[in-house]
Swiss-Prot record:
PANTHER family: 5'-METHYLTHIOADENOSINE/S-ADENOSYLHOMOCYSTEINE NUCLEOSIDASE, 5'-METHYLTHIOADENOSINE_S-ADENOSYLHOMOCYSTEINE NUCLEOSIDASE
Pathway info: Amino-acid biosynthesis; L-methionine biosynthesis via salvage pathway; S-methyl-5-thio-alpha-D-ribose 1-phosphate from S-methyl-5'-thioadenosine (hydrolase route): step 1/2
Residues where substrate binds: 78, 153, 174-175
Pfam families (UniProt xref): PNP_UDP_1
EC number: 3.2.2.9
Protein's recorded name: 5'-methylthioadenosine/S-adenosylhomocysteine nucleosidase
Family from the record: Belongs to the PNP/UDP phosphorylase family. MtnN subfamily.
Biological processes per GO annotation: L-methionine salvage from methylthioadenosine; L-methionine salvage from S-adenosylmethionine; nucleoside catabolic process
Disulfide bonds: none
Catalytic activity: S-adenosyl-L-homocysteine + H2O = S-(5-deoxy-D-ribos-5-yl)-L-homocysteine + adenine; S-methyl-5'-thioadenosine + H2O = 5-(methylsulfanyl)-D-ribose + adenine; 5'-deoxyadenosine + H2O = 5-deoxy-D-ribose + adenine
A GO MF label: methylthioadenosine nucleosidase activity
Keywords: Amino-acid biosynthesis, Hydrolase, Methionine biosynthesis
Functional description taken from the UniProt entry: Catalyzes the irreversible cleavage of the glycosidic bond in both 5'-methylthioadenosine (MTA) and S-adenosylhomocysteine (SAH/AdoHcy) to adenine and the corresponding thioribose, 5'-methylthioribose and S-ribosylhomocysteine, respectively. Also cleaves 5'-deoxyadenosine, a toxic by-product of radical S-adenosylmethionine (SAM) enzymes, into 5-deoxyribose and adenine.
Length: 231
């Protein structure tokens, strides 16, 4: 099995990249691909860039040119579930766009035309993520809906919009729905596993930039455990 791993930013892939053996680097269309073996598994690690378009371009190349069998999306996310704290983990059961609106044509809020309303994560990969979490006894995890938009959600108004239209949302970020839609169109199994960098309606002693390295550590540990289970 060849495992594709996607992170948007350098900080989100650096820990994994440093652990790849036989590392080879390929750059194309603004995306950087790191190939080799990770914990004995054949992997392609993609640093896609931030946002949905960058993520879709990178995921397309990852699947079409690097022929990965599954896709794991790692990195940070903003928590919407009140039980979450900084460093906790979210696992996708489904992923939706929160910034798509073609409801004028009868679609659900967040549903892109001619696409399903939600992109469903692979059940086996969800189970693998949950098994991987057992090696991280200090981390709490929530599984559920992750919503994506080309928006850094930082205002009460945007938070309220998302809660109103997607009441079961557990976390938000800026790439997962594009990755999920691309995987859907290629019929490639995926799961999103991210660490919480901040939580809506909770005061944080750290800024996003300050916490990002800690979120990267948590999400990378989760991915490493998953890769070991999947190989």
């Amino acid at each position: 099995m060849k495992i594709g791993i996607i992170g948007a930013m350098e900080q989100e892939v650096a820990i994994l990249k440093d652990k790849i053996e036989g590392l080879s680097t390929i750059t194309k269309a603004g995306c950087t691909f790191y190939t080799g073996t990770l914990n004995g598994a054949d992997v392609v690690l993609l640093q896609s860039g931030i946002g949905k378009v960058a993520a879709a371009v990178g995921t397309t190349l990852l699947i079409a040119e690097h022929n990965v069998d599954v896709v794991l999306n790692t990195g940070s996310a903003g928590g919407f579930d009140s039980s979450l704290n900084l460093g906790d983990v979210v696992i996708s059961t489904e992923v939706r766009h929160h910034d798509a609106d073609v409801t004028a044509f009868g679609y659900e809020m967040g549903q892109m035309a001619q696409q399903p309303a939600a992109f469903i994560a692979d059940e086996k990969l969800i189970t693998t993520a949950e098994q991987a979490l057992t090696e991280m006894s200090d981390k709490h995890a929530v599984r559920g809906l992750i919503c994506t938009g080309d928006v850094f959600v930082c205002t009460p108004e945007r938070q309220e919009f998302i809660r109103t239209h997607f009441p079961s949302v557990i976390a938000v970020e800026m790439e997962a729905s594009a990755i999920a839609q691309t995987c859907h169109q290629f019929n490639t199994p995926f799961v999103v596993v991210r660490a919480i960098s901040d939580v809506a309606d909770k005061e944080s002693p750290m800024s996003f930039d300050e916490f990002l390295p800690l979120a990267a550590q948590s999400s990378s540990e989760m991915v490493l455990n998953m890769v070991t289970l999947l190989k």
